[in-house]
């Protein structure tokens, strides 16, 4: 959520930033109008309360002097009713303002390129060279079924489209990837490992910006009023919701693996085969809490943490900065890492790393103190995929496939695969 002072002091800037996303900036005028009404109501209410205090003194004085106080008592009752009415009006305006503010996205950083869609994202780095095959490479969805690593048909029977059973060495590879990523982030990148709740309440979803605007993208357990998480970013960021982080704690760096659940509303017809776009998938997440002046350097570091995984696995990738028309709701700036997939003859997103500045912290009331005597300030929150496990799985299977149908295990993963260096079709 944005600071109301930005609307008061820099309305033109806020309007232009909203328009860069392709959104309607008239909400700024709506907020300013409501804010003016609110301030007038507060002023009027304070005047009434001051008069009520004065009348209370007059009543007491008249009673001490044994004078008739009926007139001032009547005024006191009228003032009480008027104050109650003003408070009700103020509460209504507050609810209207919050209802609008909570749907306004974060302000985009000045260095984010302008554009309308992912086609306008700007490549800033490329690593590795896509492999040239001496044979016709297969798509990962064909490879995993031939090697008995996955079963899409039985998953469809059990759960519907966009689900998968990972079987045999497919399940082992998925587990190995999660263990490898978590180990890398905790032992080399300084993150604290967390196991997170995968069902959360509405306040938690509100804190990170999924609610109320993106409810259609979520799965909800209606009876309990809980939501399945679309990413571990949600519970990790809300760890400090409604708390003041004590001096000396920041920077705080969490990592955790979880299943992620997404309805993929609006994705009909896209990536219908394989592991790229599922309703349920595994992901390793990185979340950071930073002092405001440190968050931009933290974004660069977090992105290189994700890149280190891809490089150690030997997977060609590129880094792009998302344009104004493609960046997420809560982010001020986002880097996407895109891995090379031979089946697409293109790069596909495998990680997003974002600086959300104080946007989520204001929604979730996450504050910190620089020292014991200091006034609490809003922290900056960052999140990044480190990485999307299923897409990493697909990238390994496609980029490390062999002509005989086997798949070579990247060297970095061998210890996590029990020493196994190759995946072959099971004998049975």
UniProtKB/Swiss-Prot annotation:
Binding residue positions for ATP: 262-264, 349-352
Location, primary (coarse class): cytoplasm
PROSITE patterns found in the cross-reference section: AA_TRNA_LIGASE_II (PS50862)
EC number of this enzyme: 6.1.1.11
A Gene Ontology BP annotation from the UniProt entry: seryl-tRNA aminoacylation
Binding site for L-serine: 231-233, 285, 385
Domain notes: Consists of two distinct domains, a catalytic core and a N-terminal extension that is involved in tRNA binding.
Family, per entry: Belongs to the class-II aminoacyl-tRNA synthetase family. Type-1 seryl-tRNA synthetase subfamily.
Reported function: Catalyzes the attachment of serine to tRNA(Ser). Is also able to aminoacylate tRNA(Sec) with serine, to form the misacylated tRNA L-seryl-tRNA(Sec), which will be further converted into selenocysteinyl-tRNA(Sec).
NCBIfam families the UniProt entry points to: serS
Name by which UniProt lists this protein: Serine--tRNA ligase
């Amino acid at each position: 959520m944005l600071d109301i002072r930005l609307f008061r002091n820099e309305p033109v800037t806020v309007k232009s930033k909203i328009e860069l996303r392709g959104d309607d900036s008239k909400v700024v005028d709506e907020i300013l109008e409501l804010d003016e009404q609110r301030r007038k109501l507060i002023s009027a209410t304070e005047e009434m309360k001051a008069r009520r205090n004065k009348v209370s003194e007059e009543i007491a004085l008249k009673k001490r002097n044994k004078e008739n106080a009926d007139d001032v008592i009547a005024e006191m009752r009228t003032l009480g009713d008027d104050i109650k009415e003003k408070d009700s009006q103020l509460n209504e305006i507050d609810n209207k303002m919050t209802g609008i503010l909570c749907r306004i996205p974060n302000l985009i950083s000045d260095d984010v390129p302008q554009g309308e869609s992912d086609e306008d994202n700007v490549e800033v780095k490329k690593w590795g060279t896509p492999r040239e095959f001496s044979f016709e490479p297969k798509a990962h969805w064909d490879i995993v079924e031939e090697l008995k690593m996955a079963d899409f048909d039985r998953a469809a029977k059990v759960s519907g489209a966009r689900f998968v059973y990972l079987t045999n060495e497919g399940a082992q590879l998925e587990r190995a990837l999660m263990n490898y990523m978590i180990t890398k982030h905790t032992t080399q990148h300084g993150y604290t490992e967390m196991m997170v709740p995968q069902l959360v309440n509405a306040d938690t979803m509100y804190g990170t910006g999924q609610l109320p605007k993106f409810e259609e993208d979520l799965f909800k357990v209606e009876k309990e009023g809980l939501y399945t998480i679309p990413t571990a970013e949600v519970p990790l960021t809300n760890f400090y919701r409604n708390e003041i982080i004590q001096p000396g704690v920041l920077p705080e760096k969490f990592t955790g693996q979880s299943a992620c659940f997404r309805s993929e509303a609006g994705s009909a017809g896209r990536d219908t085969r394989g592991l790229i776009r599922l309703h349920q998938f595994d992901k390793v997440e990185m979340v950071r809490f930073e002092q405001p002046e440190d968050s931009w350097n933290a974004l660069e570091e977090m992105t290189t943490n994700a890149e280190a995984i891809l490089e150690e696995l030997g997977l060609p990738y590129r880094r792009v900065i998302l344009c104004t028309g493609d960046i997420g709701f809560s982010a001020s700036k986002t880097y996407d890492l895109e891995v090379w997939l031979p089946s697409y003859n293109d790069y596909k997103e495998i990680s997003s790393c974002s600086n959300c500045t104080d946007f989520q912290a204001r929604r979730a009331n996450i504050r910190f103190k620089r020292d014991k005597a200091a006034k609490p300030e809003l922290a900056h929150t960052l999140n990044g995929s480190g990485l999307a496990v299923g897409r990493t799985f697909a990238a390994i299977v496609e980029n490390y496939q062999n002509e005989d149908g086997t798949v070579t295990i990247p060297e970095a993963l061998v210890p996590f695969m029990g020493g196994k260096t190759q995946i072959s079709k099971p004998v049975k």
